[in-house]
């Protein structure tokens, strides 16, 4: 049985509209990820936007809980039911049906469709909810209904806002499987498994805690697909179901070790985390050191560390992608489409971590010998900063040893990096905007945009908002606010294209244009008093023409990238302005100069072809069949606007464009760079900006000709390079003539050197010292280009140079190693050089004593 599909069809038969799963990255600045089925409907529940025409909805929402308030990460792999990624089945009523229907529908689906035995089902209700108990008594006996308090059976979105009691449905998995002290109804054991939560949103909580009844109560329900699948398949752990076992079996095959449930936590962690990693990467989230990308990095590195425990020593997670696609690709077709690029990104990230994981674990284990109860915060910071161990990974390792972390010390050392920590929400949206948008929608609906046809329009002011987005009857001269016009030529920021600027002739300057819940609002700075009802002439700034050139060029660039680099390319972000364009896209490696030249040539070829732009509004199904590219995560209605340039490019797009590709003029790539792992960025200019770029480059060329004193620049540069080589040789010869005093001491008959070299080559000096001494332990340091280089040599002693370097390098923020007789490394923390020299002497003294 396809439980996901059965659930959706069941509620469609009850007149619910099927709603596709929203992207994991929510349209909500207060959340890192969609973590519940109701999140996409939050603005409806809070009243920010009106209810849809059909106030009944059903969905299967992909969710992630791995950060913030809802964080299941540390439990994953160690319990039968926790996941970082899961699917939430839910049915919703926006002021339509209430408790009776919600309870009846749930009972009918569980017992009628899923065929779960009625005698296995238990329910809980809020201790004050007599109505829910009475409704449940029509289905179950009173001895299988439990009343609980606010902690378990009262749900609220926040400190204020919609809230209400809830009723949870539990499945008894049997005393024969679970007989622990917590395996009773209401306990924390796994015998009684919560499968469905019915939330009855019937109150509004005010700031003083007062509850007021809502005029139109609503229903929000959530049922975990993974739990229901496990029960239907007769297994007592989600990980033993068909959603996870094929992944675990693949891990077994790769590592050639049999999975045993009792000791298989690492297998389960890997199976869970590869699902999360695949979905996030396929939806455009990429590995980074901040925000959502850092959560993704933490999850993958946690899985890699568990793989390391199993015996993996090289990338393996990427080999699991195809297995997940086989399980889930039928429902989420984008997984297969993105699998190639996702595998490349995962393999690269794994390879990065495998380079440091052994050294990091060695440092961790070394510190364990010095730890009784509290693990050093300094070492935890070093693991984080030097070896790439996320803090929760270190805490995970400590939990296995029943140890705690000196968190205060770790936080103290993190102060230098607080700017990064504060940016952890970068890319997750601006602050949540609250204002009188619902009233505008209910009163006027969306306004009319005529900017495709005209850049000038006589309009009437329907509404004004102050800077806090609240109603104003008028705006005085010299203040900022927002205007809502009945008809507007101003394009609202969307799809990477910046919002239009311009003026309301004689009244105000238009500073920006944005969309709020479908409302096209322009930010203005008034020049004289502006009132609701005023007639104005809205004029778009002339810079719009340059914006259209860059926007159309972005479309052509996107298509060319697909042809030149491969069909794994997908847009990861864009910016279109009057003076430049920026396009981010998935690609696992830097683009070669030859590829860049070909991309630039191909885009200019399409420009010179003079292709007429064509715009059509069609159904979303027609648009997809036409091959038009859509951006993942964008919300599209039943009808979409498709912009095409002949056979060169076809995309979903609501933006403004040139009429003919020839109007773009020319296209110049100014920069190619990496944004994060697996994401590249191309920056380019067109039109007037391209002419200005050419002019600047020509002037720069003239300046270089003057500086190298040669009209043939390459010949001039070659001459300068030759001079530099000669000067370097002279400098080296001079340094060789300078006698360097090295401090040598004798310990147990062995010559020991721990010193800093200011000039010369430290490796050559080590060799020279070896030739001068029968038995030697020497380590030399040298500061070069804001880094510390170090080399160690051993002769006639049991000490090992490689071990010496491995011990000292981390103190300087570096790493390295080598043979027993010679080793070298580099570090980036010059401030710790004195400390490193002291420790180097202490270490070697202990070894040879």
Curated annotation (Swiss-Prot):
Enzyme class: ligase
Cellular compartments annotated: Cytoplasm
Highest taxon of source: Bacteria
Family annotation (PROSITE patterns): AA_TRNA_LIGASE_II_ALA
CDD domains: AlaRS_core
Residues the entry annotates as binding Zn(2+): 551, 555, 653, 657
Gene Ontology terms, MF aspect: alanine-tRNA ligase activity; aminoacyl-tRNA deacylase activity; ATP binding; tRNA binding; zinc ion binding
Gene3D superfamilies noted in UniProt: 2.40.30.130, 3.10.310.40, 3.30.54.20, Bira Bifunctional Protein, Domain 2, Threonyl-trna Synthetase, Chain A, domain 2
Cofactor: Zn(2+)
SUPFAM superfamilies in the record: Class II aaRS and biotin synthetases, Putative anticodon-binding domain of alanyl-tRNA synthetase (AlaRS), ThrRS/AlaRS common domain, Translation proteins
CC cofactor note: Binds 1 zinc ion per subunit.
A single GO BP: alanyl-tRNA aminoacylation
GO CC terms, sorted: cytosol
Reactions catalysed according to its record: tRNA(Ala) + L-alanine + ATP = L-alanyl-tRNA(Ala) + AMP + diphosphate
UniProt KW Transport keyword: no
Keywords recorded for this protein, A-Z: Aminoacyl-tRNA synthetase, ATP-binding, Cytoplasm, Ligase, Metal-binding, Nucleotide-binding, Protein biosynthesis, RNA-binding, tRNA-binding, Zinc
Entry EC number(s): 6.1.1.7
UniProt entry tagged with the keyword Nucleotide-binding: yes
Subcellular location, principal: cytoplasm
Family annotation (Pfam families): DHHA1, tRNA-synt_2c, tRNA_SAD
InterPro entries tied to this protein: aa-tRNA-synth_II/BPL/LPL (IPR045864), Ala-tRNA-lgiase_IIc (IPR002318), Ala-tRNA-ligase_IIc_anticod-bd (IPR018162), Ala-tRNA-synth_IIc_core (IPR018165), Ala-tRNA-synth_IIc_N (IPR018164), Ala-tRNA_ligase (IPR050058), Ala_tRNA_ligase_euk/bac (IPR023033), DHHA1_dom (IPR003156)
NCBIfam families (alphabetical): alaS
Role: Catalyzes the attachment of alanine to tRNA(Ala) in a two-step reaction: alanine is first activated by ATP to form Ala-AMP and then transferred to the acceptor end of tRNA(Ala). Also edits incorrectly charged Ser-tRNA(Ala) and Gly-tRNA(Ala) via its editing domain.
Assigned protein family: Belongs to the class-II aminoacyl-tRNA synthetase family.
Domain notes: Consists of three domains; the N-terminal catalytic domain, the editing domain and the C-terminal C-Ala domain. The editing domain removes incorrectly charged amino acids, while the C-Ala domain, along with tRNA(Ala), serves as a bridge to cooperatively bring together the editing and aminoacylation centers thus stimulating deacylation of misacylated tRNAs.
Protein name: Alanine--tRNA ligase
Protein source organism: Sulfurimonas denitrificans (strain ATCC 33889 / DSM 1251)
